[in-house]
């Protein structure tokens, strides 16, 4: 009974607009567990929240829970099956974590607390992120309650690419570990969706390989179980995100990757072709096509429609050797 009271005291349940506005006025950092009515708040995270609240202090860190269907402000999170945690400081949304990942949650909490502390100490200007910057250039939800048309909200200017954690890596329980490595490498996951891809989707996805003997095997593998679909961007450095992601993946053949790029994802998690754990779009054109196929509501920024600097010059010089050109997987 005592533990139950601690849980209630730890997380304030927000079920009205008034309570939501009261939360926005709180000092320090507030982490809101957005949940669906049919599953309730994410209880496995309570012990982490209790630990961090004790370590950080009651004044600087607060926790709340809110059912997505009860508040208009949470409309875009309605019907999402994975837990979503929203981070608010000074009444503004500053971070979003999707999924029950205690390591990532703890890291994000500490980062946001440190950022919040530095502003008054260094005399800097507080910059609140927008929903579009945190969740990506997405037309989400696909319709508005007032019946109006959604505009292109790709205002962040970030270029994006597609990543897929394939069924073989998911089946071996490596998905969350791979996601952590992706984030540690400086990539931002704008959207993550776990689902089993359909045969029709994969036939369209790999249509450029339809005449190859490996086509049916590849399609069957990609439809054999759940995959994690990722929309990725990169905020650090000047390298195009498509190129950066391909480099991070390593060569398509895991055996080649282990020899030439042992730190790459395919070297660490791939076994043999076609079980190379992760997919990356080959170039900007492929990224746009693949994103449009698997995320039909995705809205491209102007930068996504442009080739990265130097791409035209590279094409004029001649064909570029790409060990993945034949496989494109």
Curated annotation (Swiss-Prot):
The keyword Cytoplasm applies. Coiled coil: none annotated. Residues 11-115 form the Thioredoxin domain. This is Thioredoxin domain-containing protein 6. Monomer and homodimer. It holds the Pfam family NDK. InterPro entries: NDK-like_dom, NDK-like_dom_sf, Nucleoside_diP_kinase, Thioredoxin-like_sf, Thioredoxin_CS, Thioredoxin_domain, TXND_domain-containing. Its main location: cytoplasm. Belongs to the NDK family. Keywords: Cell projection, Cytoplasm, Cytoskeleton. The keyword Cytoplasm applies. GO terms for cellular component: cell projection; cytoskeleton; dynein axonemal particle. GO terms for molecular function: nucleoside diphosphate kinase activity. It is found in: Cytoplasm, Cytoskeleton, Cilium axoneme; Dynein axonemal particle. GO terms for biological process: CTP biosynthetic process; GTP biosynthetic process; UTP biosynthetic process. Expressed in lung airway epithelium (at protein level). Residues 303-329 are annotated as: Disordered. Residues 157-303 are annotated as: NDK. May be a regulator of microtubule physiology.
